[in-house]
């Protein structure tokens, strides 16, 4: 059996998001979806997985709400169900930047994946990766700036210390688009004028371009049991252990915590070394 993995987000004011939780959970359970949906006043953010018919039905349901009628999503395939449960959670933010009263309606301009390579090749464009450091280590765009953040909440502090001219063009990207979209709103609030972001993120770029230019280097970390995907969006078979750099098997990948790609041999490391690693996440 094959499964469809759908990722989506939408920044839109949902004043009644508390009331939406139960009805969305019931709709997902009725079609046996698994995954996580986050709801906040600023919008919705989710990754869900199920059979083809289930995915179609849940989006018909969600888009019946006029505020979500423009909802779009990205799909990939898996041979196994990457999630064990269906969770619908209420949050202050759909992606946690930790900045109060940020107006996400004032944000950067989209760059379509088809034009991304040409855009970032311009000499006056700075490319910024808004993902966490452990994600960047698996793969990134050539010449992209790595802020070396351990979590998304670290990004504002890095951005405030960013010394480049606010008149330069800034092109930002992330996995699926949500972090870079919110980051552009923050950069705009700091006074950066020309701010852009990759529409749909790395996953859309790889889906549309198949990395023909070679600008993408490595694998793309994803937040499910696949751990990472290659340029064709297939589960990666090239992931290496963060301790010894040996290749990590598919079975081992299914059981690792987020950001901790560890082979079987290194799982027997001393407690002290594991604790040292964990404190750096």
From Swiss-Prot:
Give the Gene3D superfamilies listed for this entry.
3.30.70.100, Rhodanese-like domain (3.40.250.10)
The protein's matches in Pfam families, at most eight in alphabetical order, are given as:
Rhodanese (PF00581), UPF0176_N (PF17773)
- Keywords of this protein's UniProt record, alphabetized? Oxidoreductase, tRNA processing
Question: What positions does the domain Rhodanese occupy?
Answer: 121-214
So what does this thing catalyse?
uridine(34) in tRNA + AH2 + O2 = 5-hydroxyuridine(34) in tRNA + A + H2O
Q: Does the keyword Oxidoreductase apply?
A: yes
SUPFAM superfamilies found in the cross-reference section: Rhodanese/Cell cycle control phosphatase
Task: Name a GO molecular-function annotation.
Answer: oxidoreductase activity, acting on paired donors, with incorporation or reduction of molecular oxygen
Give TM segment ranges. none
Against InterPro entries, the record matches this protein to: Rhodanese-like_dom, Rhodanese-like_dom_sf, TrhO, TRHO_N
Q: Catalytic center at which residues?
A: 174
Q: Name one GO biological process term.
A: tRNA modification
**Annotated EC:** 1.14.-.-
Q: Does the keyword tRNA processing apply?
A: yes
What does the record give as the function of this protein? Catalyzes oxygen-dependent 5-hydroxyuridine (ho5U) modification at position 34 in tRNAs.
Matching entries from HAMAP family are given as: TrhO
Q: Which family does it belong to?
A: Belongs to the TrhO family.
Query: Can you say what this protein is called?
Result: tRNA uridine(34) hydroxylase
Which source organism does the UniProt entry give?
A: Wolbachia pipientis subsp. Culex pipiens (strain wPip)
Gene that encodes it: trhO
């Amino acid at each position: 059996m094959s499964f469809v993995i759908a990722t989506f987000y939408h920044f839109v004011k949902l004043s009644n998001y508390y009331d939406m939780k139960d009805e969305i959970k019931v709709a997902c359970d009725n079609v046996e979806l698994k995954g996580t949906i986050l709801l906040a006043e600023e919008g919705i953010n989710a990754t869900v997985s199920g059979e083809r018919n289930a995915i179609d039905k849940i989006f018909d349901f969600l888009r019946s709400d006029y505020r979500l009628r423009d909802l779009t999503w990205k799909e990939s395939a898996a041979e196994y169900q990457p999630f064990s449960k269906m969770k619908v959670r209420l949050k202050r933010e759909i992606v946690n930047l930790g900045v109060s009263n940020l107006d996400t309606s004032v944000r950067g301009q989209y760059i379509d994946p088809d034009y991304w390579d040409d855009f970032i090749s311009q000499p006056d464009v700075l490319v910024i990766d808004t993902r966490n450091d452990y994600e960047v280590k698996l793969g990134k765009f050539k010449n992209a700036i790595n802020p070396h953040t351990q979590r998304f909440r670290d990004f504002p502090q890095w951005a405030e210390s960013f010394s480049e001219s606010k008149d330069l063009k800034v092109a930002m990207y992330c996995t699926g688009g949500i972090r870079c979209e919110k980051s552009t709103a923050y950069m705009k609030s700091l006074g950066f004028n020309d701010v852009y972001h990759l529409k749909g993120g790395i996953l859309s770029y790889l889906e549309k371009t198949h990395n023909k230019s070679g600008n993408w280097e490595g694998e793309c970390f994803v937040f499910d049991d696949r751990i990472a995907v290659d340029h064709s969006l297939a589960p990666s078979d090239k992931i290496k252990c963060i301790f010894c750099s040996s290749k990590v098997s598919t079975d081992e990948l299914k059981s690792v915590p987020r950001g901790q790609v560890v082979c079987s041999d290194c799982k027997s490391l001393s407690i002290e070394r594991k604790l040292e690693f964990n404190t750096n996440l």
